[in-house]
Regions:
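N-terminal non-catalytic cap/leader segment that marks the start of a structured domain
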Residues: 1-105, 109, 205, 213, ...
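C-terminal structural segment of proteins
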Residues: 5-8, 13-14, 125, 139-153
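A generic local secondary-structure boundary/capping motif
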Residues: 1, 71-73, 103-106, 130-139, ...
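Short loop segments at secondary-structure junctions
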Residues: 16-18, 120-121, 150-154, 174-175, ...
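Short, structured patches in soluble enzyme cores that scaffold and shape functional sites
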Residues: 118-120, 127, 134, 141-145, ...
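Short coil/turn connectors at secondary-structure junctions
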Residues: 77-79, 110-113, 119, 135-136, ...
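A gly/proline- and charged-residue-enriched helix-loop-helix capping module
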Residues: 104-127
């Protein structure tokens, strides 16, 4: 199933080039009150919502053309955004070779430097666009495969890790280059783009063989395959959960391949991963 959040927080089911409005399925979510849970309510109850959607589509819910809707982040309230710093060998070489990328920061192997966190306030959907936070700096796109955690866990072994994934989407880990810590440079508003929608894990046969592609203004900048990840999705979940409990709705950004490059106000990025969809993201003027 491919589910989007669109327009005014509507829930949509993707069918070809249409979005079926299945917002009514959200009525199965339990009421929640202050203090809010540490997980995303929809992702935590995804199985129940999916069953309700199957019922709903027997009727004749409203349909929209995909081109007519505004796509929001498929996860509304991620508790945390966990990210892999340098997780493709060719990007490690590129980052070490280019002073404009490394800024005298030591670029270590992921096994040694570990993961980092991005502010959840940086998350947006494809249609929300983003504004360059520091126009005085180099700002880069990083296309990444994103796994959305579906089931809570701590110390999850790699062999069971994929059972904790609700689904996958395309991610852009936007980055201000410079000497500061990654968590600061990668957390401005809009610097985590998720979309175009959530593809549930049962629809992804092998997450280790997906093609990634991003074009900026029609020019290919990054083209890679997840088979070249240094630590794959299961290993990243094992690694992350050895430090903290993963919750439903937590976002795992798996790292970017080689080809990162600068973007400017007015640029249009088109990012796609095989089976997960293609999203167009504009950088505000
Ligand atoms: Mn990244």
């Amino acid at each position: 199933m491919q589910l989007c959040r669109f327009n005014d927080d509507r829930l949509g089911l993707i069918r070809g080039d249409e979005v079926i409005d299945v917002t009514a399925a959200l009525k199965v979510l339990p009421p929640c009150s202050y203090p809010l849970p540490k997980h995303d309510l929809l992702i935590a109850h995804l199985d129940t919502v999916r069953a309700e959607i199957e019922q709903l589509i027997q009727g004749a819910p409203l349909r929209h053309a995909l081109t007519d809707v505004l796509l929001l982040s498929p996860v509304a309230n991620p508790g945390k955004v966990v990210a892999a710093p340098v997780n493709y060998a060719k990007h490690l070489a590129e980052a070490r070779d280019d002073q404009a990328i490394h800024h005298q920061n030591q670029i270590g192997e992921i096994q040694r430097v570990g993961l980092f966190l991005k502010a959840s306030s940086s998350v947006v959907g494809a249609s929300e666009g983003l504004r360059i936070a520091r126009p005085d700096r180099r700002n880069d796109h990083e296309i990444e495969l994103v796994a959305v955690i579906g089931k809570a866990g701590r110390n999850i072994p790699a062999a069971q890790a994929l059972e904790h994934v609700a689904g996958y989407c395309v991610g852009l880990d936007m980055t201000v280059r410079g000497p500061e810590e990654r968590s600061m440079r990668k957390s401005p508003d809009g610097y985590t783009v998720l979309g175009p929608w959530l593809t549930t894990a049962d629809e992804v046969a092998d997450v280790g063989t997906l093609d990634l592609l991003i074009e900026v203004n029609g020019e290919v900048r990054q083209r890679a395959n997840t088979r070249d990840l240094i630590i794959g999705v299961a290993g990243l979940i094992e690694f992350a959960s050895s430090f903290y409990t993963l919750q439903p709705g937590d976002i795992l950004m798996t790292g970017t391949p080689e080809g990162v490059s600068q973007v400017f106000p007015g640029d249009r990025m088109v990012a796609q991963i095989s089976g997960l969809g293609r999203m167009t993201v504009d950088i505000d003027d």
